[in-house]
Amino acid sequence: MGCTLSAEDKAAVERSKMIDRNLREDGEKAAKEVKLLLLGAGESGKSTIVKQMKIIHEDGYSEDECKQYKVVVYSNTIQSIIAIIRAMGRLKIDFGESARADDARQLFVLAGSAEEGVMTSELAGVIKRLWRDGGVQACFSRSREYQLNDSASYYLNDLDRISQTNYIPTQQDVLRTRVKTTGIVETHFTFKELYFKMFDVGGQRSERKKWIHCFEGVTAIIFCVALSDYDLVLAEDEEMNRMHESMKLFDSICNNKWFTDTSIILFLNKKDLFEEKIKRSPLTICYPEYTGSNTYEEAAAYIQCQFEDLNRRKDTKEVYTHFTCATDTKNVQFVFDAVTDVIIKNNLKECGLY
């Protein structure tokens, strides 16, 4: 009697092969799909990282898209000079030249009636004169004592260019814009044959309750910390040091049961601002127990240790730390390349393919 398979048995074998093939294909597909969650306190640079992904992995911002950011550039510039002028009153700093008091009054009038996306030569002239004033500069140097955008000096130092009638924001201008992220912003791009879905989540406390919806199936978390926040307080709670808030948040994310198998990538961001600030503002403002020198290398290494020491599962979980400057495209490109290699390795392990 021959050992032939019945039609039914053949169909069963084919079905089994198809299931195996589908499982393998699903595994490979899962290994190629990366869900990245960008977390961190407010103003830590998350949205700037997302903008860099568009510049690096897509085709950047078109001229039309850049034009749309003109409104934000002008708004950020005007709000920055207004924040400094208001702080002068609180900090009891006088203008270097008495005539600037008239300019300050004029600023509020012109800013209140300014057409969106337009900077008149009159308004630009008022802002330039104010920004050059010794009292305004003295107040700017004390910006840790009030809330001020990181991009303030970038725009205010370049008023001649950005106030031109034919001005179109550059990619760098776009990177420097600040708009508070509310809700969840999703970005898709392909890199090293991986399909990335990146989720930027609002960092202010009021936004955090929305994060939970993103947690399922996350491949990796990029947690952003602004190194330069060590001597600042929160916009939403002026009693809370920003770095302490970041540490508290990192602790809750790094040791969360949801993320037992999730790669944690720590971006210690704004290293350029930190390098400047540490020369004049001691790290002991944030860490009174710190006894090291106020050099970039030593102070940055100390902050890195403070965060990495929060990981309570060091034996099974690694935190991958990178020092970043989110406005520097080359730096972000280099770091993201290294991050992707870690993700590929860990992703393949998860799918049993490594």
Curated annotation (Swiss-Prot):
It comes from the Eukaryota. The keyword Mitochondrion does not apply. Keywords: Cell cycle, Cell division, Cell membrane, Cytoplasm, Cytoskeleton, GTP-binding, Lipoprotein, Magnesium, Membrane, Metal-binding, Myristate, Nucleotide-binding, Palmitate, Transducer. Mg(2+) binds at residues 47, 181. The keyword Cell membrane applies. Residues 196-205 are annotated as: G3 motif. It is found in: Cytoplasm; Cell membrane; Cytoplasm, Cytoskeleton, Microtubule organizing center, Centrosome. One of its GO terms (molecular function) is G-protein beta/gamma-subunit complex binding. A lipid is attached at residue 2 (N-myristoyl glycine). Residues 173-181 are annotated as: G2 motif. Heterotrimeric G proteins are composed of 3 units; alpha, beta and gamma. The alpha subunit contains the guanine nucleotide binding site. GTP binding causes dissociation of the heterotrimer, liberating the individual subunits so that they can interact with downstream effector proteins. Forms a complex with CCDC88A/GIV and EGFR which leads to enhanced EGFR signaling and triggering of cell migration; ligand stimulation is required for recruitment of GNAI3 to the complex. Interacts (inactive GDP-bound form) with CCDC88A/GIV (via GBA motif); the interaction leads to activation of GNAI3. Heterotrimeric guanine nucleotide-binding proteins (G proteins) function as transducers downstream of G protein-coupled receptors (GPCRs) in numerous signaling cascades. The alpha chain contains the guanine nucleotide binding site and alternates between an active, GTP-bound state and an inactive, GDP-bound state. Signaling by an activated GPCR promotes GDP release and GTP binding. The alpha subunit has a low GTPase activity that converts bound GTP to GDP, thereby terminating the signal. Both GDP release and GTP hydrolysis are modulated by numerous regulatory proteins. This is Guanine nucleotide-binding protein G(i) subunit alpha-3. It comes from Mus musculus (Mouse). The lineage of its organism: Eukaryota, Metazoa, Chordata, Craniata, Vertebrata. The gene is Gnai3.
